A protein has these predicted regions:
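Dual-mode signal for accessory low-complexity, basic/Gly-rich regions
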Residues: 81-215
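Residue-level signal for secondary-structure boundary elements
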Residues: 30-37, 67-68, 187-192, 197
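Residue-identity detector for glutamine
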Residues: 2, 15, 67-69, 73-76, ...
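Amphipathic alpha-helical
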Residues: 65-90
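Internal alpha/beta scaffold segment
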Residues: 1-66, 87, 132-133
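Short N-terminal helix-initiation segments at or just after the protein's N-terminus
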Residues: 55-73, 159-173
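A sequence-level detector of short, solvent-exposed, charge-rich linear segments
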Residues: 41-44, 48, 64, 70-75, ...
Length: 215
């Protein structure tokens, strides 16, 4: 399955691009049909940029939403970690709904005002690995009493703190070819027959409640 989104009709793929995507999907399905059945594997892995985006959105982003720090049913993964390191010090995370494009890519999380009328603004969530704040609507939580313009809602629902455009930045970077070499080296170091490279992830799903296996 593959979906396409665009800011305007002109941004949608051409007929030729759609046909190329269909052919690529067919090749992928054929490869899956021929692929051997695999067993659970414990070993080194690398996520591509696209796969890492889904990972950060689901695993980290949802747990930094303000309302998830409230209530006994929530896992509250990071509630008590403000001011503490939660990521390596070369990583920082922000959420910026004011930017409409990243390079040539249109960002669907952009907005001028959130659903509570607050003007959109960038929020630095994690700086140099240290947790600074949460994504806030006007619903207060302990030590955070006001909105930071991330109150968003589906039709008919009360606005809550939600992600816009989650941006992960790093002070360390290497070429993809070098990452692949490091993956092979790590697999050999761990005496594993191979490592895993995740090119894409079809979708994400996060449950943050206390009784969930994901909590």
């Amino acid at each position: 399955e593959q979906t396409f989104e665009a800011e305007t009709v002109d941004g949608l793929p051409s007929q030729a691009d759609l046909e190329a995507a269909m052919r690529e999907l067919g090749r992928s399905l054929e490869s899956l049909r021929k692929a051997p059945v695999t067993e659970p594997f414990d070993g080194p892995a690398i996520l591509s940029g696209r796969a890492a985006a889904v990972f950060f959105h689901e695993v980290l982003g949802h747990r930094l939403e303000g309302q998830r720090q409230r209530g006994e049913q929530e896992g509250q993964t990071f509630t008590k970690d403000v001011g503490k390191p939660v990521l390596p010090d070369f990583l920082s995370v922000s959420d910026d709904p004011t930017i409409r494009r990243f390079g040539s890519t249109w960002l669907s999380g952009s907005y001028e005002y959130d659903d509570e009328g607050e003007k959109a603004r960038r929020v630095d969530l994690i700086s140099d690995g240290v947790l600074k704040t949460f994504l806030m609507s006007r619903l207060p939580i302990a030590n955070f009493g006001s909105s930071n313009s991330h109150g968003r809602a589906e039709t008919g629902h009360v606005p809550t703190g939600r992600q816009g455009n989650l941006i992960v930045s790093s002070t360390k970077s290497v070429l993809e070819s070098e990452l692949r070499k490091q993956l092979i080296e790590e697999a050999k170091k761990q005496s594993k027959p191979y490592g895993l490279y995740f090119e894409d992830i079809s979708s994400g799903f996060a449950v943050t409640t206390r009784r969930s296996p994901q909590a």
